[in-house]
Every structure is written in C-alpha cells, then in structure tokens.
Amino acid sequence: MAVFLVERSIPGMSHHDLLLAARALEESCRRLAPGRVRHLRTLQVLGGSRCLSLFEADSKDLVARANNAAQFLFSSVEEVEEVVSRGGDRTDLP
C-alpha cells in the first residue's frame, strides 16, 4: 500500500474538534474499505491554521473518499514517500 498526505485548512478549529474529526476519519476508513485505507495520524501545525493527515491506502481516490465520507474538507491529497524512518535511519541505506 502507498502512503498519502492530506493537507487541510482548519481556521478556528479547536483541538477537541480536531480530535473528533480524526476519529471520524478512522471510522470512515473502517466503513468505506476495511483493510484498503487506514488513517495513520493527524498533525496540527502549531501557530497556524493547517493540519496534515497521513493515510495508508490502495489509491488516492480511496483517501479522498474517506475524507469526504468523514465530512472533513481538504485542500490536497498527495502520495508521499518516507525518507527517514521513525528510528531516524535513512530508508535508502543498506
């Protein structure tokens, strides 16, 4: 499966509302296509009015459909590639 980054503008959205929206994303992924689209995490840009969500999915279309089903508006959906793993190691080194 590929990884996708969803960017959205969230002016005036509280932390609590963002938590509820992230839960709605998780639920819409489970209902829409179990095992084919999964919400990994949502990050809020501090001091700004944006958030970024990561998804693992079979297609960009599935990610867009999951976001639409959760009624969480977004600006873009792009496929991304990990450059540094969680442990801090580069993924392209032997």
Give the residues covered by each predicted segment.
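Short S/T/G/P-rich N-terminal loop/turn motif that feeds into the first structured element of a domain
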Residues: 1-31, 40, 48-49, 60, ...
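Short, well-ordered coil/turn elements that cap or connect secondary structure elements
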Residues: 32-34, 69-72
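A short linear hydrophobic-aromatic micro-motif
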Residues: 36-42, 76
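Short hydrophobic/aromatic beta-strand micro-patches
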Residues: 54-56
